UniProtKB/Swiss-Prot annotation:
Keywords: Cytoplasm. One of its GO terms (cellular component) is cytoplasm. This is Nucleoid-associated protein YejK. Coiled coil: none annotated.
Amino acid sequence: MSLDINQIALHQLIKRDEQNLELVLRDSLLEPTETVVEMVAELHRVYSAKNKAYGLFSEESELAQTLRLQRQGEEDFLAFSRAATGRLRDELAKYPFADGGFVLFCHYRYLAVEYLLVAVLSNLSSMRVNENLDINPTHYLDINHADIVARIDLTEWETNPESTRYLTFLKGRVGRKVADFFMDFLGASEGLNAKAQNRGLLQAVDDFTAEAQLDKAERQNVRQQVYSYCNEQLQAGEEIELKSLSKELAGVSEVSFTEFAAEKGYELEESFPADRSTLRQLTKFAGSGGGLTINFDAMLLGERIFWDPATDTLTIKGTPPNLRDQLQRRTSGGN
């Protein structure tokens, strides 16, 4: 992995009681040792693989102002990180879920792009076996489950300040307002809505195939084609490019997909991140609620599975063997 650390700082927030988070600040930067580089590379890998929300700094963002001064050489990185940790402590203290942790600030370069990554990492306990085959306690940073993380694409921010996607962050687990306090700390507002872009793409594809007067099988083939392209981009860590997708769909209609999307006003960006859960709707129907979970291939609708919107009834012809076996055993037992 071609990742180079420029500067990295680590501080700590300790929760002493329900009202107080104590600051423990380092007086020097971390040295980019092999272990430190390996840790940052793992955090970069884990973060890059997760679904993220996009944002941009507000004009009043204190973090953006001090970061800009740091980038201009008017403040050193350690002082910037210490002051930012203090502001993070003030925001975290407003929320009852504040648990503290290790606060990491890392300025690094990956594939010619500069990033600033900010994360709050938890320290977990575990066990290890030493060279004498004794079992001893140990501690480790829980990188895989880190959900208080934000990353600023410094290259994008400085070369394209009007962008709505240079800042990304994780929204956290359900029921925790991680995004709320992190947005306050960053002084940011939500930018590009990747999920909305993906939903718009799905609607545009459906309308595109309808206007081309394709039959059911042809329309599903186009959806599968779109899904294959988008999934390949997702797996490669690349964004969906409308021009590239339009080339994939050449021949579907006399009008190109990019021209169709622009004329119909779907407001799709030239490129945007793929959203896995939204894209699945191209090839599958899925839903759950009231003790019922249903998931089936889209091509089965109208063939083995039929929906009556008037009565909201779903009819399935031919159940899966394992389900049929369970049903037969249950009904034959009289339960």
